[in-house]
Amino acid sequence: MKPEYRRLNHVTINVPAGEHEKVRAFYGGVLGLEEIPFPESLASTYDLIWFKCLDFLIHVDFTPPFFRPAENRHPALEVKNIGEVRRHFESLGAEIREALVIPDRDRFYVLDPFGNYFEIIEMHADQVR
């Protein structure tokens, strides 16, 4: 039987151990995501903070070992008003990187304090997603 996918549930981002305040400042402050409670049943085994993003979660994992992020492995978040979003990130001191042009969208990257890339995209209205 072919799987019937309902939605993306979560992505996991790896960061160095002990950087909880930097994570909260970036993911909660810069990206504007809501932190949600981490299940107590997992707390003795894992060190994570969970953030809600639309209808999926971002699990930020402090559990060693930390792997150096790679630019080509990243989540992409679609936004409205990409220019305003970019100015907001810049006003908060977030690191911005340019992205190569793709004709049907505007995009750039924002990096968390540990080098994890997030692609920020605004699709042109007449394009299929």
Region annotations inferred by a language model:
Residues 1-24, 73-75, 127-129:
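N-terminal beta-strand motif that seeds the catalytic metal site of vicinal oxygen chelate
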Residues 47-49, 73, 104-108:
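Short beta-strand micro-motifs in enzyme catalytic cores
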Residues 68-89:
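Mid-chain, well-packed structural core segment of small domains
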Residues 41-44, 66-67, 100-103:
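A short beta-turn/loop motif at secondary-structure boundaries
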Residues 13-57:
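Core segments of cupin and vicinal oxygen chelate
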Residues 1-7, 90-129:
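Vicinal oxygen chelate
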